[in-house]
Amino acid sequence: MFGRFIRQYSTSKNIINVNELIVEKTKTPFQKYTDKTKLVFGKQFSDHMIEVQWTKEEGWGVPKISGYHNLSIPPSASVLHYALECFEGMKAYKDSNGKIRLFRPDQNMNRFLNSAKRICLPEFNKEAVIELIKKLCVLDKDWIPEGKGYSLYLRPTLIATQNSLGVGASNSALMFVIASPVGPYYPEGFKPVKLIADDQYVRAWAGGSGAFKLGSNYAPTIFPQLEAAKKGFSQVLWLLNDYVTEVGTMNMFVFWNNAQGEKELITPPLGDGTILPGVTRDSILKLTQQWGEFKITEKNFTMTELAKAIKEGRVFEAFGAGTAAIVSPIESISYKGENYSIPIDASLNCGPLTKRISDSIMAIQYGETNSDWSVIVD
């Protein structure tokens, strides 16, 4: 996919040396949360962070873990003017034995690297970043809340720091990782969401950057989201020429009887740059394929087709999928002034498949089910 991009940096300069890591423990630790049930996503941060500087001339510098602190970059830094920035979202979990676990960190690093390439930020050795993240998790292990649904959210980020207003590949960059303790997305059980499908605004398009985790993809979605909220909707169901793409910041899944009468779990395909390759998305596809109980399809489908299927009673469930919630059940979609209701099991506040997927993935994340997807942090 990236063959058409010119490789600008030598391989030797793309290596982060974990053995050179410098650890400076903070002398002013934060006051840690006292009630984990009151944690709010992204509002409190752990004591330490990772930083690694990069320059075109020298490559990656010495990695460092130190106390959480503000960054110092010039006001002309490329990231501030041209959005040369990419990031990841992943979590560290603490199992019932107190062991720290990461969920498929290799997949996050694959996407992180692909995002960096897309905007000409420096390449890096993925394994080294995972090792640095593990060391941060061990150092800040007391910040990982115990219990199902609780975790330490990790935010690897890579920004261009070149001191220039010219539009082009940056000759300097900074990678950093911060961490935030978080609670369950649905602390009191699933809460189905109401969507509005509106083609007035477009999140991504073929050949664009929607398949990469760039900050520039998120800023334009805020206004449509606020407009949707004013109308009483939880999220926007993003369309592209009537084709269903994503829901809010999540991948979209529909479980239905398709037009051929087959029971099918369907999600929009990757490949044209429109859909973000979600780690949870991939996990759901692989997990349900292992079950072998119904057809699994990555295929484009339109909102018109979905509305018709709902009217005909062929839709069993629909849900969004992502790191924050794992799955988010959908109870209705507003489309062209008409409301389309999707079945919800009142006893579960979601559909049976949605619940089963959530339970299955969470069991892996917390080490209850043995899987190589769950990586123990030594």
From Swiss-Prot:
Gene3D superfamilies recorded: 3.30.470.10, D-amino Acid Aminotransferase, subunit A, domain 2
CC terms in the record's Gene Ontology section: mitochondrion
UniProt cross-references to InterPro entries, sorted A to Z: Aminotrans_IV, Aminotrans_IV_CS, Aminotransferase-like, B_amino_transII, BCAT-like_C, BCAT-like_N, BCAT_family
Modified residues (N6-(pyridoxal phosphate)lysine): 213
Disulfide bridges in this chain: none
Pfam families per record: Aminotran_4
Reactions the enzyme catalyzes: L-leucine + 2-oxoglutarate = 4-methyl-2-oxopentanoate + L-glutamate; L-isoleucine + 2-oxoglutarate = (S)-3-methyl-2-oxopentanoate + L-glutamate; L-valine + 2-oxoglutarate = 3-methyl-2-oxobutanoate + L-glutamate
An MF annotation (GO) of this entry: L-isoleucine-2-oxoglutarate transaminase activity
EC number of the protein: 2.6.1.42
GO terms for biological process, alphabetical: amino acid biosynthetic process; branched-chain amino acid biosynthetic process
Keyword tags: Amino-acid biosynthesis, Aminotransferase, Branched-chain amino acid biosynthesis, Pyridoxal phosphate, Transferase
NCBIfam families documented for this protein: ilvE_II, PRK13357.1
Family: Belongs to the class-IV pyridoxal-phosphate-dependent aminotransferase family.
Its job: Catalyzes the first reaction in the catabolism of the essential branched chain amino acids leucine, isoleucine, and valine.
Description of how the protein assembles with itself and partners: Homodimer.
Protein known as: Branched-chain-amino-acid aminotransferase
Organism: Dictyostelium discoideum
Organism taxonomic ancestry: Eukaryota, Amoebozoa, Evosea, Eumycetozoa, Dictyostelia
